[in-house]
């Protein structure tokens, strides 16, 4: 690698580290690194969101622990299997060449055994402590990430994250099924929201890393179509995400009014950052800002769903309706 390429790589790496600052401050042990623990909290948050959309919320502590524990173990297994499959690819990229598997810190046999063990443990925990549907959906999410996205779609099409995003959208279904034994329309709403949010979220990151992906032949949208095309696609999916998020007002069993009010600043900020990137699609700082906010956005949606199911939210909705009807009566007189 010549000096100019090395300088470009160092710049891109610094951008990536700034997007996820913990990468600078925290070095994970090899066995934890392959589990991709940074991805797990958001998966568990959307699982909780799926639970909050049901009449059975809140769940008993044992069922809640088993659901989240099983989900975390399955996500860790999926991350490890993803690292195994992409080990040779990671060796070819300086940014990833020092990871646990390509650097030889862990053997492929050890990682595979750990992934199988986590999968079995997740299955046992979910079957014994939750139900068969939650266990089956969790395994479906694992297989979707490893087989559908990593093996089939990622190396072949620019639409990889559009269809492969199903893996990240399954946790809400797991949460709903854990609570009720079935998914229900509200669970499917959150599934759809995550599906629409995922491309806009991931493509913002892919703009930062488009040269990395291009160097190893991975057809991410920014690498193939360019930043301008990608920014326009992000705009479309971002608008669809905002419209879908509003439907949560009707998806919630109660507390939809408070959810709708609190949702406004989240959607406003998301649209603002998307519009800024669309105006300057090659601005890495704008792509970074959008990527960061998109993560906070989904965490925020899930938090709003939980808040909306509290007694305070129910009382707020009741009082608001009383005021509304009182005003209506005064106007009619």
UniProtKB/Swiss-Prot annotation:
InterPro entries reported for this sequence: Protohaem_IX_farnesylTrfase (IPR006369), UbiA_prenyltransferase (IPR000537), UbiA_prenylTrfase_CS (IPR030470), UbiA_sf (IPR044878)
* Primary enzyme class: transferase
Where is this chain's protein located in or outside the cell? Cell inner membrane
Q: Which reaction does it catalyse?
A: heme b + (2E,6E)-farnesyl diphosphate + H2O = Fe(II)-heme o + diphosphate
Topological type in the membrane:
Multi-pass membrane protein
Q: Which GO terms describe its molecular function?
A: protoheme IX farnesyltransferase activity
EC number, as in UniProt: 2.5.1.141
Q: Which Pfam families match?
A: UbiA
Q: Which GO terms describe its biological process?
A: heme O biosynthetic process
Q: Does the keyword Cytoplasm apply?
A: no
Residue ranges crossing the lipid bilayer per the database entry: 64-84, 110-130, 133-153, 161-181, 189-209, 246-266, 287-307
* Biochemical pathway: Porphyrin-containing compound metabolism; heme O biosynthesis; heme O from protoheme: step 1/1
Keywords assigned: Cell inner membrane, Cell membrane, Heme biosynthesis, Membrane, Transferase, Transmembrane, Transmembrane helix
Q: Does the keyword Disulfide bond apply?
A: no
* One Gene Ontology term, aspect cellular component: plasma membrane
Extra info from the record? Carbon 2 of the heme B porphyrin ring is defined according to the Fischer nomenclature.
- Tell me the function of this protein: Converts heme B (protoheme IX) to heme O by substitution of the vinyl group on carbon 2 of heme B porphyrin ring with a hydroxyethyl farnesyl side group.
What HAMAP family does the database record attribute to this sequence? CyoE_CtaB
What the record says about family reads: Belongs to the UbiA prenyltransferase family. Protoheme IX farnesyltransferase subfamily.
Q: What is this protein called?
A: Protoheme IX farnesyltransferase
Q: Which gene encodes it?
A: ctaB
